[in-house]
C-alpha cells in the first residue's frame, strides 16, 4: 500500500495564511463562546446517540445497523461534541453528516501494523458531509497522554484511506484529548503516531478499567478489561457484555498514564482464580475481540479488593473494592440527579492529575466571589501543576457545595473535553 504524504507548498501557506488566520480566530471564539452552553447540557442529558450543541442536544440517527452507520443534521453554526465517541465538529452553517466506523486491521497495511515506529492513536471514522465546505474543523479523539511531556506532538498524523492508498496529513494542532483537522477533506480517517526512528517506544496513554458482573445465584462471574480510553471502544464493550447480561460497575480509571504495550498483572484479595492473570495494554478496534480477565466469586458475601500491577517494575497502578452491596441482582434503580459538586468530589484525583492551565478558572472563581485575591495567589504560588490543582480543589471543597458547583461550571466551560471524558468513564 502506497503512503503518499499530503503537503502544502510554502507559497500556498503564505497566500492562505492571512485568510485562514482571520477564520481561525473567529472559529476559536465560537468554540469558546459555545463551550459553556454545550457543557451545561452534559449535566442535563448524556445519551449515547446525541451530540451536544450550542442550542441543546441533537439526535443521531442509526441509518444502517449492519455497518454501524449514523446520520446527524446540525441546525446552526457552532461547535458540536458526541460524548459517546469523543468526536467533535466546528461548523459554519447547517450541515448533514454521515458517520461510520472502521477497523485499523482491515485498512492499515500489515507491515505498518507490526512496525515499531507506528502506533494507532484513536478510533477510525468514515465521515462525509453535505455540504463539505460547511465544516470548518473536525476534532478527532485520541488516547495519547500529553501531560508528562514524553510525546512529541509532531508525531501525530491524520491518516486518510482513499482509493490511491493511505494519505498522511499533519493536524493543525493537538490537544490533550483530540487533534484538530482544519479545512478537512472527507474520508475514512483516524490518528496515527509516527515515532522518530531510534526513539525508545514507551508511549503513555490514558486508559480505562471496565468491570462487569454476570449475576448467578450460585457463582457470580466477573470480567475485567484494561483498555485505552476510547469512548467508542467502551460503548462497544458495553454492548457486547449486555448481550450476555453483563452489568458494568462504576469504577475510576487509573489516575496516571499507563504505557502502551506494557503487561499488567491482575490480582485480588480473596485469592480467587483469575484467568488470565496477565493483560497487555493494547488497542483493538471496536468490533474486534477484546481481551479480559475472568474470575468467579461464589455468592459474593465479602468485599473483594482488585489490583492491577505493572509487571516489569511491580508498580501498583490501580485498585478498587467491590462490595456485595454493589452487586444488584434486582432491577436497577433510577440514577440520581446530576450534581456538579458531587462530580468534583468524586473526581478529585482525576481532576488533580488532568486539569491544565488554571488562569481562566481562577478568574471565574474570583469573579463569583468563591476565591479572594489572596487565595488565588496561594494557588498560583504552588510549584507544580498538580500541586496547583490539588490546592484549588481542596480549598473549594472546604467552601461547600455552592462553591463546588461554580468550580464545575468553570471547568466545563474551560475544558469541556475533560468533563466529557470523566463523565463517560462513570456511565
Swiss-Prot record:
Residues 336-426 form the CARD domain. It is found in: Cytoplasm; Nucleus. SUPFAM superfamilies: DEATH domain (SSF47986). Residues 187-336 are annotated as: UPA. GO terms for cellular component: NLRP3 inflammasome complex; nucleus. Its EC number is 3.4.-.-. The keyword Ubl conjugation applies. Residues 51-186 are annotated as: ZU5. It comes from the Eukaryota. The keyword Transferase does not apply. Keywords: Apoptosis, Cytoplasm, Hydrolase, Immunity, Inflammasome, Inflammatory response, Innate immunity, Necrosis, Nucleus, Protease, Ubl conjugation. CDD domains: CARD. Residues 51-336 form the FIIND domain. The record marks 186-187 as: Cleavage. It holds the Pfam family UPA-FIIND. GO terms for biological process: inflammatory response; innate immune response; proteolysis; regulation of apoptotic process; regulation of canonical NF-kappaB signal transduction. CARD8 inflammasome is inhibited by DPP8 and DPP9, which sequester the C-terminal fragment of CARD8 (Caspase recruitment domain-containing protein 8, C-terminus) in a ternary complex, thereby preventing CARD8 oligomerization and activation. CARD8 inflammasome is activated by Val-boroPro (Talabostat, PT-100), an inhibitor of dipeptidyl peptidases DPP8 and DPP9. Val-boroPro relieves inhibition of DPP8 and/or DPP9 by inducing the proteasome-mediated destruction of the N-terminal part of CARD8, releasing its C-terminal part from autoinhibition. Residues 1-23 are annotated as: Disordered. GO terms for molecular function: cysteine-type endopeptidase activator activity involved in apoptotic process; peptidase activity. InterPro entries: CARD, DEATH-like_dom_sf, FIIND_dom, NLRP_Inflammasome. The disordered region is required for activation of the CARD8 inflammasome. Interacts with DPP9; leading to inhibit activation of the inflammasome. DPP9 acts via formation of a ternary complex, composed of a DPP9 homodimer, one full-length CARD8 protein, and one cleaved C-terminus of CARD8 (Caspase recruitment domain-containing protein 8, C-terminus). Interacts with DPP8; leading to inhibit activation of the inflammasome, probably via formation of a ternary complex with DPP8. Interacts with NLRP3. Interacts with IKBKG/NEMO. Interacts with DRAL. Binds to caspase-1 (CASP1), CARD16/pseudo-ICE and CARD18/ICEBERG. Interacts with NLRP2 (via NACHT domain). Inflammasome sensor, which mediates inflammasome activation in response to various pathogen-associated signals, leading to subsequent pyroptosis of CD4(+) T-cells and macrophages. Inflammasomes are supramolecular complexes that assemble in the cytosol in response to pathogens and other damage-associated signals and play critical roles in innate immunity and inflammation. Acts as a recognition receptor (PRR): recognizes specific pathogens and other damage-associated signals, such as Val-boroPro inhibitor, and mediates CARD8 inflammasome activation. This is Caspase recruitment domain-containing protein 8. It comes from Pongo abelii (Sumatran orangutan).
Amino acid at each position: 500500500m502506497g503512503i503518499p504524504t499530503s503537503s502544502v507548498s510554502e507559497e500556498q501557506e503564505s497566500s492562505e495564511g492571512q485568510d485562514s488566520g482571520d477564520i481561525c480566530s473567529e472559529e476559536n471564539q465560537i468554540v469558546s463562546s459555545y463551550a459553556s452552553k454545550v457543557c451545561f447540557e452534559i449535566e442535563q442529558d448524556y445519551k449515547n446517540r446525541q451530540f451536544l450543541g450550542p442550542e441543546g442536544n441533537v439526535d443521531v440517527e442509526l441509518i444502517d445497523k449492519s455497518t454501524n452507520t449514523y446520520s446527524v443534521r446540525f441546525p446552526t453554526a457552532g461547535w458540536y461534541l458526541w460524548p459517546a465517541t469523543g468526536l467533535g465538529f466546528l461548523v459554519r452553517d447547517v450541515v448533514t453528516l454521515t458517520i461510520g466506523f472502521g477497523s485499523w486491521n482491515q485498512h492499515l497495511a500489515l507491515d505498518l501494523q507490526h512496525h515499531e515506529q507506528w502506533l494507532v492513536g484513536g478510533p477510525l471514522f468514515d465521515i462525509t458531509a453535505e455540504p463539505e465546505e460547511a465544516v470548518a474543523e473536525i476534532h478527532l479523539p485520541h488516547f495519547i497522554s500529553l501531560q508528562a511531556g514524553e510525546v512529541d506532538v509532531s508525531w501525530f498524523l491524520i491518516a486518510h484511506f482513499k482509493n490511491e492508498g493511505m494519505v498522511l496529513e499533519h493536524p493543525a494542532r493537538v490537544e490533550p484529548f483530540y487533534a484538530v483537522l482544519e479545512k478537512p477533506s472527507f474520508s475514512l480517517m483516524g490518528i496515527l503516531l509516527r515515532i522518530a526512528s531510534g526513539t525508545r517506544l514507551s508511549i503513555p496513554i490514558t486508559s480505562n478499567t471496565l468491570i462487569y458482573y454476570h449475576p448467578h445465584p450460585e457463582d457470580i462471574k466477573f470480567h475485567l478489561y484494561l483498555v485505552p480510553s476510547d469512548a467508542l471502544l467502551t460503548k462497544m464493550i458495553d454492548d457486547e457484555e449486555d448481550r450476555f447480561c453483563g452489568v458494568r460497575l462504576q469504577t475510576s480509571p487509573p489516575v496516571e498514564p499507563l504505557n502502551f504495550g506494557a503487561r499488567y498483572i491482575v490480582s485480588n484479595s480473596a485469592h480467587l482464580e483469575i484467568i488470565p492473570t496477565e493483560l497487555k495494554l493494547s488497542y483493538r478496534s471496536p468490533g474486534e475481540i477484546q481481551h479480559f480477565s475472568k474470575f468467579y466469586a461464589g455468592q459474593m458475601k465479602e468485599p473483594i479488593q482488585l489490583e492491577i500491577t505493572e509487571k516489569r517494575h511491580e508498580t501498583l497502578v490501580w485498585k478498587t473494592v467491590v462490595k456485595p452491596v454493589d452487586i444488584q441482582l434486582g432491577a436497577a434503580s433510577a440514577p440520581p440527579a446530576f450534581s456538579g459538586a458531587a462530580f468534583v468530589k468524586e473526581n478529585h484525583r482525576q481532576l488533580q492529575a488532568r486539569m491544565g492551565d488554571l488562569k481562566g478558572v481562577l478568574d471565574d472563581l474570583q469573579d463569583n466571589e468563591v476565591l479572594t485575591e489572596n487565595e488565588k495567589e496561594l494557588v498560583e504560588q504552588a510549584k507544580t501543576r498538580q500541586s496547583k490543582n490539588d490546592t484549588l480543589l481542596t480549598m473549594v471543597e472546604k467552601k461547600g457545595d455552592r462553591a463546588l458547583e461554580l468550580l464545575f461550571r468553570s471547568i466545563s466551560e474551560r475544558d469541556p473535553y475533560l468533563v466529557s471524558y470523566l463523565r463517560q468513564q462513570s456511565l
